[in-house]
Amino acid sequence: MGRFTRRGFVAAASTVAGNLLLSKRSGQAQALSNSKKASHPGSDLKLWYTSPASQWVDALPIGNGRLGAMVFGGGATKPVDAKDSAADHAAGPVPTDPAKETLVLNEDTLWSGLPVDGNNLDAKQYLTAVRQAVLDQKDYHLADQICHKMQGLFAEAYQPIGSLHVDCTHSGAVTGYRRELDLASATVTTRYKVDDVEYERSAFASAPDRAIVLRISASKPGQLHATIWAAGALVKSVQTIGSNRLLLTGKAAKHIAGAGHPGSEIPVVHSDVPGEGMYYAAITEVKTEGGQIAAHEGKLLIQGATTCTLLLTVTTGYRSFDQKPDMSQDEVSQRASRQLDAAATRTYSDLVRRHVEDYRRFFDRVTLSLGPDKTDSNTAASQPTDERLKNFAAAPDPSLLALYFQYGRYLLISSSRPGTQPANLQGIWNYQVQPPWSCNWTSNINIQMNYWPAESCNLTECTEPLLAFIADLSHTGARAARETYGLPGWVSHHNIDLWRAANPVGTGVGSPTWANWSMSGPWLCGHLYEHYRFTRDREFLRTRAYPLMKGSAEFCLAWLIEDGNGHLTTCPSESTENDFMAPDGKPAMTSAGCTMDMALIRELFTNCILSAKELGVDEVFAAKLDAARSRLIPYQVGKFGQLQEWAIDFEESTPGQRHMSHMYPLYPGSEITPRGTPQLAKAARVSLERRLANGGAYTGWSRAWAIAFWSRLGDGDKAWESLSMLMQHSTNVNLFDTHPAGKTSIFQIDGNFGATAAIAEMLMQSHTGVIDLLPALPVAWPAGEVKGLKARGAVEVGLRWEQGKAVSAMIRPDFSGEYQLRAPEGQKIESISNGSSVPQRTLSDGSVACRLTAKRTYRVSFA
């Protein structure tokens, strides 16, 4: 992994005339930003700081779904050796110069490797043996050993493009420094002053123009002097094209060993053979107004300009998950040049306008205020974000939580768009060649959590990459089912890469609790059906969702076996990443019929049965699913009063495990609810309390899950307590979620997304078919307003509350029909109207039913 190199400024001259200042255009962009702020009254939508980022994890992210960049707002003050570890510089901290700029770049298809069959072809011969070890011999340790023999190859790793640097030189000292990320315009801006000249840098990632844009301006003519250069650990060459273009080319590794995984593999394997690792190209065009621009020794040199605009595009040799990435370097570079040519035809003001308009059509759908609007200089929003975070424990800051909520939506918009790859463990942002957990799609909760907020937070289009991903996975998963287990349908495990690896990974040394867990297919299929529930898109259900769900159900139906007690069970079965204490008092991993397996299969079968009925198909198959569903091991309450994690009431070897897989039917599932299954809800609460009492939820994503659990249990104050813990202990200064890893913390984006979804759950729930309003409102949020949340049934919901009580709600369905609403605890729905009162009837569960007309907005009042 290479550090980011920089060389000294080399004087050169090549005159390029420039006559027009861009202050007018800059003003147009600012006007767009101001109009955006006006559309979010009472909202605080900026992360801002008074010093540059001194390490990668403190930089500010921009992205268009495909391209991503971390914007430092500064650059290293001294040269760094490109051959040394990138982590030493990028993970820092290192001294930074605010007059410089650093963008660490990513493109969502740059991965190591190529399509391979990672299945262990000897695996299926061990399936009977592992089942006998568990069910007949009760030898769980032997079962663990056999599971190792069923493991295949590790997945590949997400790779960094490199870094782009702009080193400005000034004769005086920098004062008045500020860098910010404005969620209203998806733009990172850095401002400072040198003597009487004000400097500004603005960066954004445009989806419509498929480019990253960096604009640098001075308030007085001729005051910009800069060197533009690029570097990276995988970079093969950096060269200039003409006097104003910089071309960076490189090649991803043939193979990357999983960071932190056991084994003796060479960590990084490079190859010069075409198709063994993909080529990539990043090309930057520089336009100046005023001054001179010259190319010299792989750098671009700017002298005496007033503005400087950089356009950057990136392409890779990726073709498809099932095709070798054998595109030549020349072809990849030409594709990048064509993309840049298209973007370069637009003026800067057009680039800004198109970017902001595109972004706002997603972001503007939801607004959230968790307190009265305050505009005086003493409000928390007037403090830098790192200070607000530091002060959170002593001075709880509801507006910071509203900002955090919107930041999660921003990150999803920036990392997942139709046509892109899904958001991975770090979204689309990564600086390491060998990143933690390969920066892949870990599917025993992480990729699923990434998409928890997509539907409820009104970003349904952002789920499209996940839906397409599942379709791809069904192909490799069918091969995994056949070659690993000798079974029909499709299966996937916990570790998936660009090539859609579906096999159990580990190469014989992986822990069975993650390597041999085989239930990610049913979990991912839950997202297919949830997308249908939120959108009511019947054509999607018929042509895309149901066929994939059916394939997963076919595997599960064949995977189930008799347990000897009249039930159907799964074996081998793992409760994700948690061991249990075997009868001999030693930890073991592999058993039969873990609670999560039963929950996922029961949910999948139910969704398939409902879909088949809705579509009028597969009556016989649905009947088979129904018969099998009735024989699944039921949920059980253990000796501590807890929801059992395993079919046998084992004790956990790690009572504070961050994974809480047996709680799936509470959230994100919907089988356990306080009203519908009160005894099981009580047991789930005991399980949650035991986990937290033993130090559980120590990672950001696990804490986010706890917030969602408390929300589903209707305990707003406990949800707030966990949310507060997340802000204090699992949130970085740039509001990235963190995962503790020894002496340092690792960025993992799932906690951001999980917490955003959990906040939405505190304000509105719809998983039972009833739209529950303010189901888990904490005392800490006595007043507030939310607009634009989405409920299942394709209903948009807004709410306003004061003194802890709902004042009004706005309901807008996409379809005509009957809907059920429930008032907050202690209140009742007084009226529902759309110009005239809508008849309503109270049901036995306390909710009210009413018929609503599509595309009309209804006002709900409360008593």
Sequence positions of predicted segments:
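N-terminal export signals
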Residues: 2-3, 7-29
